[in-house]
């Protein structure tokens, strides 16, 4: 008993030390953000306010890394295409590169889209709205990460600005038409992600997994799937990211994507042909072909995420910085280049937040919603980029977080559907077997079928293996070869996994309202502090 208590104490002590180290590193980063604002900020007499804003922006960036980046690498980690440590390293590097290389476009503050500019034309009020929105979004992301719910960082910031804007100028100031698009994205994003992921999963099952000669089918089909992913990724990066560096028209975008896709097809075709002698005609062996594409997908998604979502942390901070620097500039609608020091705060904060607190949400997306193999993870990654690309071309409001999580749920629901079909198929097989056997061994056959129906996946495998080896048992002699094959097919298609749908959907629905409430309260609190302190 004493030894057990000592071990538990040592375990708790190690966890405390680990948590303390994480907090210390986070505090050091926030101090670094404050120093950057002090050294490079040009806020004149309002230097302390800019330092405070930089600390809040850094805190927001860390929460984005801890919560939102899980969508990019979760499926790859859950399918074991890459280790947790490897995923964090790749994602952290690519997030920083994306933020610094392609995230510094001319920034137009979100404020102009959520609250009408004419209602907030005072620089002092505008700065308080931005501070309240940043802090409210960061606090909600922190809570969502603690409870294990991946939520949209964009919606968190939108809610914060909406709440602070209403507290500053009333409900009339809110752009309700823009917010209706946010509400629509709650349905559009996960639904599109789920449907596209389900389509590609069924395509892979029909063209590879359900074939007798899986190996030959995979050697033919997989290079085309990887080429399609290359086309969509290259097009996505051009449309969503690289246009910030150099604008290209639609025809050139498509041509560049097709050229890259053709090149990747040729290279990957050679890769699979070289790997062919090592492959077996099994699902597990074919899965290995998706390893490399998944790693590249995680890296590219992280790069794109760093370029896009870093604005949620640095957009309000950049707006505050510019307002403090030039009091005569038009409030909230001025376009300004983001200072490099602000880009560094955003990029480093996302990378640090991912490294310290990202594994929890990575596990949630990668394995807790549903078990994923590499084929399924590939479908999720492909669905994510296709959905974002389609939505951007159609002008639909979507959230990358909702898309990826929706795709994971879609894969899980499809597997549940296949499981139900397997059960119905098993019921028909069972009835046919029982009807075909009228001997003294009927009771034993019925008992075997009942045990098979109730067994889990591993137990079914053992029962089929035992049935195969036991040539002299009554059941083995009575069951025909076709009947045994039917049972084996039912076993292979059945998958059991619980989901956490309710918690995540609830978190999605309350993100904007909770962030708005926090934003309003924090705006009022900032005004109170300024007035009395």
From Swiss-Prot:
GO terms for molecular function: phosphate transmembrane transporter activity. GO terms for cellular component: plasma membrane. The chain crosses the membrane at residues 23-43, 47-67, 81-101, 129-149, 156-176, 182-202, 221-241, 248-268, 286-306, 338-358, 372-392, 509-529. The keyword Iron-sulfur does not apply. It comes from the Bacteria. Keywords: Cell membrane, Membrane, Phosphate transport, Transmembrane, Transmembrane helix, Transport. It is found in: Cell membrane. The keyword Transmembrane applies. One of its GO terms (biological process) is phosphate ion transmembrane transport. It is a multi-pass membrane protein. InterPro entries: Phos_transporter. PANTHER family: PHOSPHATE TRANSPORTER. Potential transporter for phosphate. Belongs to the inorganic phosphate transporter (PiT) (TC 2.A.20) family. This is Putative phosphate permease HP_1491. It comes from Helicobacter pylori (strain ATCC 700392 / 26695). The lineage of its organism: Bacteria, Pseudomonadati, Campylobacterota, Epsilonproteobacteria, Campylobacterales.
């Amino acid at each position: 008993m004493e030894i057990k208590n000592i071990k538990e104490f040592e375990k708790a002590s190690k966890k405390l030390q680990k948590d303390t180290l994480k907090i210390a590193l986070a505090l050091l980063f926030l101090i670094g953000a404050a120093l950057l604002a002090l050294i490079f900020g040009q806020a004149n007499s309002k230097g302390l306010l800019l330092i405070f804003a930089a600390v809040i922006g850094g805190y927001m960036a860390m929460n984005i890394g801890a919560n939102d980046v899980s969508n990019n690498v979760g499926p790859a980690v859950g399918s074991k295409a890459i280790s947790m440590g490897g995923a964090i390293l790749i994602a952290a590097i690519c997030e920083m590169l994306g933020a610094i290389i392609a995230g510094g476009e001319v920034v137009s503050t979100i404020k102009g889209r959520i609250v009408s500019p004419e209602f907030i034309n005072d620089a002092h009020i505008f700065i308080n709205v931005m501070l309240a929105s940043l802090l409210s979004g960061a606090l909600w992301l922190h809570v969502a990460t603690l409870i294990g719910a991946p939520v949209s960082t964009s919606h968190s910031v939108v809610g914060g600005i909406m709440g602070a804007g209403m507290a500053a100028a009333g409900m009339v100031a809110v752009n309700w038409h823009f917010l209706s698009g946010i509400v629509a994205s709650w349905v559009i994003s996960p639904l599109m992600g789920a449907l596209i992921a389900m389509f590609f999963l069924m395509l892979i099952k029909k063209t590879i997994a359900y074939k007798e000669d899986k190996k030959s089918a995979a050697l033919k089909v997989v290079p085309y799937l990887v080429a399609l992913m290359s086309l969509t990724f290259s097009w996505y990066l051009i449309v969503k990211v690289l246009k910030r560096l150099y604008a290209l028209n639609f025809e050139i975008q498509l041509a560049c994507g097709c050229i890259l896709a053709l090149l990747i097809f040729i290279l990957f075709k050679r890769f699979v042909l070289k790997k062919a002698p090592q492959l077996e005609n099994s699902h597990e062996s074919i899965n290995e072909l998706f390893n490399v594409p998944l790693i590249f997908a995680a890296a590219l998604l992280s790069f794109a995420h760093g370029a896009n979502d870093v604005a949620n942390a640095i957009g309000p901070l950049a707006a505050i910085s510019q307002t403090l620097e030039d009091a005569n500039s038009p409030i909230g609608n001025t376009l300004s280049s983001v200072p490099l020091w602000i880009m560094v705060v955003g990029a480093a904060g996302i990378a640090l937040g991912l490294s310290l607190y990202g594994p929890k949400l990575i596990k949630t997306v990668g394995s807790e919603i549903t078990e994923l193999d590499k084929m399924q993870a590939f479908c999720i990654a492909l669905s994510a980029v296709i959905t974002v690309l389609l939505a951007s071309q159609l002008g639909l409001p979507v959230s990358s977080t909702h898309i990826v999580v929706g795709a994971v749920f879609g894969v899980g629901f499809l597997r549940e559907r296949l499981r139900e079909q397997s059960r119905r198929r098993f019921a028909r097989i069972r009835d046919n077997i029982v009807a075909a056997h009228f001997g003294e061994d009927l009771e034993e056959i019925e008992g075997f079928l009942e045990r098979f129906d109730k067994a889990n996946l591993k137990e079914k495998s053992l029962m089929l293996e035992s049935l195969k080896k036991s040539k002299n048992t009554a059941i083995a002699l009575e069951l025909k070869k076709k009947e045994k094959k039917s049972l084996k097919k039912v076993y292979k298609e059945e998958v059991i996994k619980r989901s956490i749908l309710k918690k995540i959907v609830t978190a999605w629905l309350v993100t904007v309202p909770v962030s708005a409430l926090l934003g309003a309260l924090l705006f009022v609190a900032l005004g109170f502090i300024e007035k009395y302190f």
